[in-house]
Structure formats: C-alpha cells, structure tokens
Design a protein with these regions (language model features):
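A short beta-strand motif characteristic of beta-propeller blades
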Residues: 43-49, 277-281, 402-411, 464-470, ...
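Small/polar beta-strand repeat architecture
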Residues: 1-3, 14-15, 19-20, 88-292, ...
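Surface-exposed extracellular loop regions of Gram-negative outer-membrane beta-barrel proteins
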Residues: 487-513
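Beta-propeller blade signature
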Residues: 444-453, 594-601
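Beta-sheet repeat architectures centered on beta-propellers
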Residues: 1-96, 255-265, 269, 273-274, ...
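Beta-rich globular "head" domains
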Residues: 120-130, 175-182, 340, 344-345, ...
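Hydrophobic or amphipathic alpha-helical targeting/insertion segments
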Residues: 88, 298-313
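Beta-strand initiation motifs
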Residues: 86-88, 318-321, 399-404, 456-463, ...
C-alpha cells in the first residue's frame, strides 16, 4: 500500500527525535512556506568593492534628491554606501602639525612616526599632508597605525594602488615614490600579466603620484597591455636609507579611535558590573564591542558609537565632498558648487597646499554665506579668516561627519550616549544612557531628547520641547525601537513604553514588562506590529503586552551560545517570508556562525522555528531596496533572496541545504514494515541548473532507542538522487526510488549541494507492506 508522509512545518528540538514525531528535527538553509520546507534564496554581493572592518550597523534612507544611501558602521570606519561604493565619512578626532616626524630604516617598509600629542591607538587611522621626501618615500594619504609606543607609533608603507593597463603600465598611489625605490605588489584578486605578487620591482619614470615599474633598477618599464586584472591591489615600498627624523613639516589628521571586532573577555576584581555575581568574587567583563546606532534626520544622518558622542553628516556636502577654490584676500573667499549656511562646520583637504591662514584637518565655520560663496572663521559667528601667500593643487570640503555639538547652533548636546534613535513621527532625536545636562557623567538609565525639529538644541526651556527622564527598573538601557504608536525602551531587566504627551512633560514612560532580559542592542526586530527579541534564556514578543515567545528550539539554541559574545547577536526581518532572523555565535566561537528563524506566518499564526549555519555581521530588510541586505566577513554587503547560489565574493558557489525529519512510526503497532519504494513529491522550480537534483535518504530504525539500522537496506539502497527531467508541459522529476528497507520507525533527509539548484518538498509516499516481528526486539518473534 502507499502511505502519504505529511509532516508539520517547523523544526522541533525540545524533545527526543521520537517525541517530535510527525515533524522536522534538523535543518540548514531551509525555510518553511505554506507548510512545506524549501531551500532559502541565494545571495549576491552588491559590488566588487569592500570596506574596512566588520560591519555591525546598517541604515537605509533616501535624500531629497532621490539618492539611495546606506550607513555602514564597522569597528574601524563609518561609511555611506552609494551605488555600490563605500564612501568613508569617519569623523576626525584631532589634527596636529609635526616637524620631521618620520624615521626610516634602509630596506624596510616600516616607518616610525613621532607624535607627543598622544591619543592614538593601535589600528587607528591617520592621514598625512604636506610631507617632503625621505629616503625615496614621500608619505602622504591615509595609513593604519600598526604598533604604538611612548610618543611614537609605526605604519607600513603598504597602500592601495591602481594599475592602468598599457604599454608600459601606469601605477597610481597616494604616495610619491622616487625612482629606483624597491616595491612589491599584492592583491585580493589577480594582477595583470606579467606582474607577480610578492616579487621585487623597481620604480621608474616617477611623476607625482604616478610611476611605472621595472624588473631591474633603471630598467625598461613593464608592459601590461592586453592583460586583465581583478580585485584590489596594494604596493609596498622600501626605504632607500636610514634616517632618524625627516619628512619636513607634516600635517597629521587622526580619525576617531577604532574599536574591537569582537568581545575580548577580561577577568578579575571589579571587572564585572556593580552587583553582578557573588560578593568578593572577580567577575568576567569585556572590552566594549564597537556598536553603532544611526538614523536619518531628514536627508542627513545622525550616528554614534555606543559609549561615544553624537555625529552628524550633512547630505548637502555629499559622499565624496565638494571641490572648492579660494580667493586669497582679506578675508579669503571660498567658492564651491553647494550652498552652506552660516554656522556650518567644515574641514578642508587638499592634494597640494592651502594658502596661509588655513590648514588641513582644522574645523572652520561658514560665515558671510551668500550661497555658494562664503568665508571661513575659527569659531561659529567669528571673524572671517584672512588668507595670504600661495596655494597649489586641488582642494575639497571633506565629506566626513562632524560632532553634532560642533554646529554653531548646538546647545547642550549629549557628549556620551549608548544608543541614538530618531522619532519618525514627532521628529525628536533621542539619546539613551547619556550624560546629564551640564554634566560629563554618564547615566546609563537616563533618556534625553532634543527640541522638536531641531537636532542641535538639547537645552530644556519653556519655549521648546527638549527634555529628559530617568528610568528606574534595571541598571542600564540596552536599546530602543520606534513602533507604530510608541517608542519601546529596553533596560537589562524591563521594557518601557515611551509616549508623546505634549508640553510640559513632552514624553512619558510606562513600564510594560518586568523580569525580562535582552542580549544586545541589535537583538530586537519589528514586524507586523509586533516587536520580537532574544533574551538570555528565551525569546519574547511585545504586541501591547509582553509575552514569552514559544520556541521549539529554546534548549537547542541557548545551550549552544557563546555568552561572552552576547553583544554580537543581531536580528532582522525578512518580511517577504514572514521571518524574524537572529544571528549568534555558537559555543566556543568568537564569530557569528549560526542563525535561528521564527516564521510568524506558519502553523495558522502560531509560528514555526528553524535554524542553520551562516556567517553574517549585520542585517537590514528595507523597503527602499529590492532585497534584504546583509554584511559579511568578506567586508562587503550582499543582497539576500537573490538567485539560488552563493556569490558573496564574486565567484559563484553552491549552497548546501538539508532538512531531516524526526523519527516517525511507519505503521502503528509492533509489526515491522518492508518498504520497497518511495515516491518523491518535489519541485525544482526556480533552479538555473539544467538538471537540478537532490538526494533523498531514508533512515530506518527498529525502535526509538536502537539507533539507525546498519546496514540501512536489505540488499539494496536507502538513498537515491531525485532529478528534474522536464519542465513542460508539466514539471517532471524522478517518479519513484526503489529501496529495500525493513523497519518499525524511520527518519528521512533531503539535501542538495550542487550549483543552480533550489527546491521545495511536498508530501512523499511510501510503498510498503507488513513484514512480521523481529526477534530480540522486545516482542515475541513471528
């Protein structure tokens, strides 16, 4: 007879394989739709460019001019993605003028920089302007600090280089290199022929920032005409001599300090938070993970790192800055293509020299603006600066973000915060866990908000709506989220609803959840009017009341999380499939390698759970883009649900997907059953392979405690490929699989690992007959 096998949607690991009968027990890269399992969609990188660091924050918005942008916050930088390019807007921490700061060693690519001003840390970024040559090297542009010492740090001369394929090839980098300097090349892809990575070449025909290479000192320049190249290339130059101090007068511009890529546990007395653990016992603590919060204020962006200040990026200046010219006069006059209002802070950059009176990296303020022409002052509303002397090169207004407090109209802007949120409905800017008014002390339970429609005014007054309030339940605010009618605020022990009241209170907080937990600021997702979040031992939801979310994977998930890496956990929606995703580090892992999904649309609204393996660092499901976006460990963004394969790095790879059922009785009673064939029910619709296929495996058991029968088959096979053979007039595939299996219980598995394959399972049928009882099985033989 033929028996139809129909299993419930979702994966259940809360019980034994047998207790979870009629369901599914394990999965990887499989989802449920309309009650049946299918392989998830593929992913494609959005461009071939990459960013530096691990991305932990994504935000999508559109400017007044219709430009679609994404804020990308990493542990090393902050970028704005536009058209596949990652534009660096990392704010500046400080700028100083140094005299002969560089020390070189002959044949070495390491340069030591002396700067007694301090404030820099390992992995920070610094840009140099105005340097003169030292032993064949003119050190210009941006570098990452590799090692710090007392009043010194080191950098490597390795910098990006572009190669123009020609006869001979032309190389362009941020450094100026003298003829006969030794260099090596490296790449993330392939170098054009005949260039070979890590081979010594010599600079010839140098001219400014361009040069050519020869295989020998003073030899003929290398020809790359007709060749091809891929990836990002780097050139590393070696000093031609040893000098303790050189480079002339140098302007050094430092970006804000970088942060760690993952959580580094610390141990010892006082390392943990106050009140944590047993009195007198050293608790574990962590170096702070670099987490960003961000949101658009109109077309501009407000952003900041957890535990840091608030920054503001002005969309008027653009993602690459704005070119300008200076009329040397008393005062100097700047002419550019954009209109900037008085009080706007600006920083200037150049590939040459600014006139006397102005310097690279210094914050100036627009004064006497008439639109696209204005003067500059050292302070907001101050006297315009007189310029003199000469100038050279091309000048630009920097595209980098500024401290919000640096704007001329700024008043009592918080100097430190743990989370930023912009109210879409009421146009307030909120800071959570910030410093009190007129104090530098951070209060982890304090909420402050700006005046309505004014991101710079944080001073409460009878004439505005700026204000603050302090929450009482918990020890710190973790995160916040804008929902339809309220702002939800999570502390480490409670959930509050923040609602707009109007003057004079402006905003009020109501406790809506107690004795809860939340693992990180990014562990909350909002979909279909409901907020979902991951706690430290369970999942929750809030739909007007706080509830524990039933989870069929609770024990499986929470027994396999690296609790030291809680802060890395993040969530996101995939609303096209009614899904909430959480990504986490499995036990012993310091990087994200697992995910768990709650599908709130399955099981008649009760939802379904499933899980799998995937390495991601951030997620964004935006209605302003065609696909959900994710950040990867390949330092790029990928579109999910795009295609059926893995194209994270530019090379198309197959996605391995599988699902295994729980054990189910083949037939009620104590009789064994002999199965001679299985009739698959599957569709390969959407596959791009010519003959897509997967493997169906049947796993027989005598009873729930016996383990799988070995050998699994009786003189035949227990698995076979299922292949599509036609698509018209109907989709045809392997109609039946012949097996020889004798068992009382069984589990089944379907998997695929080939390129171009996607599938959805239906209801398989088994052709079987009764086959007596087995001796030694605990029942009488027969």
């Amino acid at each position: 007879m033929l028996k139809k096998i129909q299993l419930k949607p979702g994966v259940n690991r809360e019980n034994t394989r047998y207790t979870a009968e009629n369901g599914w027990y394990s999965s990887d890269k499989v989802r449920f739709r309309q009650g049946t399992p299918e392989k998830i969609g593929g992913w494609q990188r959005i461009s071939s460019t990459t960013f530096l660091g691990l991305c932990r924050s994504l935000w999508n918005w559109v400017t007044l001019g219709g430009v679609n942008l994404i804020g990308v916050g990493t542990n090393l930088k902050f970028y704005i993605e536009q058209g596949g390019a990652y534009n660096d807007i990392t704010p500046i921490r400080s700028a100083v003028t140094l005299t002969n700061p560089f020390a070189t060693t002959s044949g070495s690519s390491t340069v030591t920089v002396t700067d007694a001003n301090g404030g820099y840390e390992t992995n920070d970024f610094v840009s140099f302007y105005g340097s003169s040559a030292i032993n064949g090297l003119t050190i210009l542009g941006e570098y990452q600090i590799t090692v710090t010492g007392t009043n010194t740090y080191t950098i490597s001369t390795a910098v990006p280089v572009s190669i123009t394929l020609a006869s001979p090839a032309v190389f362009t980098s941020q450094n100026k290199l003298a003829n006969n300097v030794e260099v090596t090349l490296s790449t993330t892809g392939t170098l054009p022929s005949p260039l070979v990575a890590n081979t010594t070449y010599y600079v010839v025909n140098t001219s400014g920032y361009t040069f050519q290479l020869s295989a020998s000192s003073g030899g003929s320049a290398i020809n790359t005409s007709g060749s091809t190249q891929t990836g990002i290339h780097t050139v590393t130059a070696k000093a031609t001599g040893t000098t303790a101090a050189g480079g002339g007068t140098v302007r050094a511009v430092y970006q804000i300090n970088t942060g760690p890529a993952n959580v580094v546990p610390l141990n010892g007395w006082g390392a943990g938070p106050w009140g944590a653990g047993t009195w007198g016992v050293g608790e574990a603590s962590t170096d702070p993970l670099r987490l960003w919060s961000q949101g658009n204020f109109g077309e501009d962006l407000i952003f900041g790192p957890r535990g840091g200040p608030i920054y503001y990026w002005d969309a008027t200046i653009g993602t690459t800055g704005a070119a300008f010219t200076i009329t040397i006069a008393a005062p100097g006059v700047v002419t550019t293509s954009i209109s900037l209002a008085d009080g706007t802070p600006v920083v200037l950059t150049t590939d040459g020299a600014l006139p006397t009176g102005l310097s690279v990296g210094t914050t100036y303020y627009v004064v006497n603006s008439t639109g696209t022409t204005f003067s500059l002052a050292a302070t907001s509303g101050g006297s315009p600066i007189t310029t003199s002397g000469s100038q050279s090169g091309n000048h630009r207004i920097s595209q980098r973000g500024f401290l919000l407090s640096a704007y001329g109209s700024a008043s009592n802007v918080p100097t430190v915060q743990n989370y930023i949120l912009i109210s879409d409905i009421n146009r307030f800017v909120f800071c959570f866990g910030c410093n009190e008014l007129a104090s530098a002390t951070q209060d982890a339970m304090l909420i402050r908000w700006s005046d309505q429609e004014d991101a710079t005014n944080w001073t409460p007054a009878a004439t505005n709506q700026a204000g603050s309030l302090r929450l009482s339940r918990g020890s710190e605010i973790i995160t916040a989220l804008q929902s339809r009618q309220e702002i939800l605020v999570w502390t480490d022990a409670s959930l509050y609803s923040l609602q707009y009241l109007g003057a004079p209170e402006v905003w009020g907080a109501q406790l809506v959840g107690e004795n809860i937990s939340i693992v990180s600021e990014n562990a909350v997702a909002y979909a279909n009017g409901v907020s979902y979040w991951m706690g430290k031992d369970k999942f929750y939801k809030y739909d007007g009341r706080t509830q524990t979310l039933r989870c069929d994977l609770r024990q499986y998930i929470f027994s396999d999380i690296d609790t030291d890496q809680y802060l890395q956990i993040f969530s996101g929606t995939n609303e096209g499939f009614n899904e909430i995703w959480w990504f986490y580090c499995s036990s012993g892992s310091t990087t994200i390698d697992r995910y768990v999904i709650f599908n709130y649309g399955e099981n008649n609204g009760e939802g379904a759970w499933y899980y799998g393996t995937m390495a991601r660092t951030a997620w964004l499901d935006s209605g302003l883009r065609n696909f959900p976006l994710a950040a990867t460990y390949s330092n790029n963004l990928v579109n999910h649900e795009s295609g059926v394969d893995d194209n994270e790095t530019g090379t198309t790879l197959p996605i391995s997907a599988s699902i295994t059922s729980a054990e189910f009785d083949i037939e009620d009673g104590d009789k064994f059953v002999f199965i001679r064939r299985a009739l698959p029910d599957i569709t390969f619709r959407g596959s791009t392979a010519g003959s897509p296929s997967g493997t169906l495996t049947l796993l027989p058991l005598k009873n729930s405690g016996s383990g799988y029968i070995s050998p699994a088959s009786v003189g035949g096979s227990n698995n076979a490929g299922v292949t599509r053979t036609a698509t018209v007039p109907i989709e045809a595939f392997t109609g039946q699989v012949y097996v020889r299996i004798r068992a009382r219980q069984m589990s089944m598995k379907f998997e695929s690992s080939a390129q171009g394959v996607t599938w959805q399972l239906g209801s398989m049928r088994l052709d079987m007959r009764e086959d007596g009882k087995a001796s030694g099985s605990g029942v009488s033989g027969g």
